[in-house]
A protein has these predicted regions:
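Terminal intrinsically disordered/low-complexity segments used for targeting and assembly
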Residues: 1-37, 207-250, 438-447
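Bacterial Sec-pathway N-terminal export signals of envelope proteins
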Residues: 24-71, 81, 231-275, 372, ...
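Short flexible linkers and secondary-structure junctions
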Residues: 24-147, 287, 291, 333-336
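Sec/SRP-type N-terminal targeting helices
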Residues: 46-50, 63, 95, 109-137, ...
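Short segments within alpha-helical structural elements
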Residues: 50, 201-223, 385-443
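Periplasmic alpha-helical coiled-coil/stalk elements that build and connect Gram-negative outer-membrane
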Residues: 57, 139-254, 370, 374, ...
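Small/polar, glycine/serine/threonine/aspartate-rich low-complexity segments that form flexible
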Residues: 73-107, 234-243, 277, 290-327, ...
């Protein structure tokens, strides 16, 4: 349950999100807010919770199966036909009524420990379903992180495009003045205007990409609102540092016993083992105790022997107790084949658990290497951005002084713009990979 506790603890740090009965009314959403809302509204999680409740009911019922079963029955019948008459001592055609009242119960004394094994099996099935809830929450959480970071990335990409266009528009005004005094040619002005047109197109695309990113996030959250939906951009990225990353084995050893998919597979294996015990118990003798207490009445006895209904019911009371022993001898090898299949189920569940552990180790190993690679790429892009910025500033100074033409200036500006976009993309790529690794490490999912 550690993963669920980790996710829930995030929400306690973010404060209350519900302000009115209509739902979420805050202007900007943090990552924790988005995760909380998505977990609450996700249909797959709700369905998994239903399955868990059903498994819980099965577990409770299996414990009740050890108790005796008691039932009562009453019947009243009408009959028409040949019946022996005690009045004339011969068979005659007549109509009459009769009935009976019984109370019966039975108790399983010994069933080869099937009841005990069934209780444990249903308990493991219940725990497997609860682990399934955590699995579903893990998937939703990671998807929200992905889409949330995609929105943040597109926000910065749009800001970059806006800044690029703003610089170009300022350059247009400056070039106009240079053209008027004869320091620049009209061709230079047309080139810069063409550059502005291209940057307007890029800005339009950036805005559309941001709208789609918001739409993807909102749909994943199942957030149906006509109000403005905006997320909160972090003030800084404190996790964007070369933190000491634990070894793969260390992260794996800390996660293997707490990760939802491992817990799910482990409980499925234990359930299969108990199911084998249940099937094997069918080879053992079964002993049950039964009892029946009842009475009956007959209209013929009332008419022919002057026995009233209440007197018949009182005099006809009887008690029957039985002890039943069932010993399996030969049943066409049905139990033998059931045991064989149950053993194969146990073996398959063990392989599945081992497969889940291998996949977890591989995922952690891959995530760790991707974090290191993404961090190195991000640092390289920062260095490239710094160099491109210096080159652009130098080119801009030379262009303003008339020492370089518009083509060289435009190349320097495009290189600088590209470097800024690459730096933003690599930053969010690194941050996403770091969030995945931190989740394996048991850290809070926050930005």
């Amino acid at each position: 349950m550690m993963r669920l506790i980790i996710i829930q603890s995030i929400f306690l740090l973010t404060g209350s999100l519900f302000n009115t009965s209509s739902g979420y009314t805050q202007e900007k959403w943090t990552l924790e807010d988005c995760i909380e809302y998505a977990l609450e509204k996700n249909i797959a999680i709700k369905r998994q919770e239903i399955s868990a409740r059903q498994a819980t009911n099965d577990y409770k019922q299996s414990k009740m199966e050890r108790l005796p079963a008691v039932s009562g029955r009453a019947s009243h019948s009408f009959r028409s036909g040949r019946t022996f008459s005690y009045d004339i001592l011969e068979y005659v055609n007549q109509e009459y009524q009769y009935g009976q009242i019984t109370l019966q119960g039975d108790l399983t004394v010994f069933s080869g420990f099937e009841a005990q094994h069934s209780i444990k099996k249903n308990e493991y099935d219940m725990k497997a379903q609860l682990s399934g809830i955590e699995e579903a929450k893990y998937d939703v959480t990671m998807n929200i992180v992905t889409y949330y970071l995609n929105v943040l990335s597109n926000i910065e990409q749009q800001q970059i495009k806006e800044e690029q266009l703003e610089v170009t528009l300022e350059q247009i005004e400056q070039t106009k003045q240079e053209v008027e005094v004869g320091n620049k040619s009209k061709g230079d002005l047309l080139e810069i205007k063409a550059q502005a047109s291209r940057e307007r197109l890029e800005l339009t695309r950036a805005k559309n990409n941001l709208k789609l990113a918001y739409l993807d996030l909102r749909q994943l959250m199942n957030l149906d609102t006509t109000e403005s939906f905006r997320i909160k951009s972090p003030e800084d990225f404190t996790s964007l540092s070369e933190n000491a990353v634990k070894t793969t084995n260390t992260i794996y050893s800390e996660s293997v016993n707490e990760f939802p998919s491992i817990g799910h597979a482990k409980y499925q294996m234990k359930s299969a083992e108990k199911n084998l015990k249940i099937v094997q118990s069918k080879r053992l003798p079964h002993l049950s105790l039964g009892a029946q207490y009842g009475t009956y009445y007959d209209e013929l006895r009332k008419d022919q022997f002057n026995l009233a209904y209440d007197r018949q019911i009182s005099e006809n009371m009887s008690l029957v107790a039985s002890l039943q022993l069932s010993i399996p001898i030969f049943n066409k090898r049905r139990i033998h084949n059931q045991i064989s299949n149950a053993k194969l189920d146990v073996l398959d569940s063990k392989y599945w658990l081992e497969q889940q552990k291998q996949d977890l180790y591989k995922d952690i190993e891959k995530a760790r290497n991707e974090v290191i690679s993404a961090y190195e790429e991000y640092q390289s892009n920062l260095e490239s951005l710094e160099s491109m910025e210096e080159a652009f500033n130098y080119s801009q100074e030379k262009y303003n002084a008339g020492l370089v033409d518009i083509v060289e200036y435009r190349i320097a500006k495009n290189n600088y713009n590209s470097a800024k976009s690459d730096a933003v993309s690599s930053r969010y790529f690194y941050l996403f990979k770091m969030k995945i690794l931190e989740f394996y490490m048991g850290k809070e999912m926050e930005i």
